[in-house]
A protein has these predicted regions:
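Amphipathic alpha-helical interaction motifs in eukaryotic regulatory proteins
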Residues: 14, 29-33, 40, 57-64, ...
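Intrinsically disordered, low-complexity regions enriched in proline, serine, glycine
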Residues: 23-25, 40-43, 50, 77-79, ...
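Eukaryotic basic, amphipathic alpha-helical target segments in cytosolic regions
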Residues: 21, 32, 36, 60, ...
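Conserved N-terminal substructure of TIR/SEFIR domains
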Residues: 1-65
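C-terminal interaction surface of TIR/SEFIR-family domains
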Residues: 1-11, 22-26, 106-153
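Structured beta-strand/turn binding interfaces of compact recognition modules in eukaryotic regulators
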Residues: 14-18, 35, 40-44, 49, ...
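Amphipathic helical hotspot of TIR/SEFIR-family domains
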Residues: 58, 62, 69-119
Length: 153
């Protein structure tokens, strides 16, 4: 579907693998692809503490939409936070449509940066002080977008 326009992918999926890979993400990816929607889903286990891989940044740039699946451990991953910051940049600069899914977390936890989100950002502050402000802003921004709240417990 995306091949006829400037977009290589219709949808970029941003998620924390340990929380969602074998449940919601696989189901969502399968359902979208069955309908002819080209998705980008990174299948590698990403290590924290490194910059976002260039191919992920490029895939975000080449995607028309982003689905951000915010889960309990999403903010503990610097990779996820870097993806989110890039997605929010694309939303602001290119009009990318962003759909947040709050998976087993409340939107208010993301918006107010409480619970696991606060704990993760406090930990990141020790090593990535210069980036944490941007990550906080990105989390606040995505939490203000109307999305879906999915509770699977």
């Amino acid at each position: 579907m995306a091949s006829t326009s400037q977009w290589k992918y219709d949808v970029f999926l941003s998620f924390r693998g340990e929380d969602t890979r074998n449940t919601l993400v696989d189901f969502l990816n399968y359902a979208l692809q069955r309908r002819g929607i080209d998705t980008f889903k990174d299948d590698e286990k990403l290590e924290g503490g490194k910059i976002i891989k260039p191919e992920l940044s490029k895939a975000i740039d080449e995607s028309r939409f982003a689905v951000v699946i915010l889960s309990e451990n999403y903010a503990s991953s610097t990779w996820c936070l870097e993806e989110l910051a890039k997605i929010i940049d694309c939303k602001k600069e290119k009009g990318m449509t962003v759909l947040p899914i709050f998976y087993n977390v409340y939107p208010s936890d993301v918006r107010k940066l409480t619970g696991t989100f606060a704990k993760a950002l406090d930990e990141h502050e020790k090593l990535f002080k210069e980036k944490v402000g941007r990550w906080r802003d990105s989390l606040n921004h995505v939490a203000d977008i109307v999305g879906y709240h999915v509770k699977n417990r």
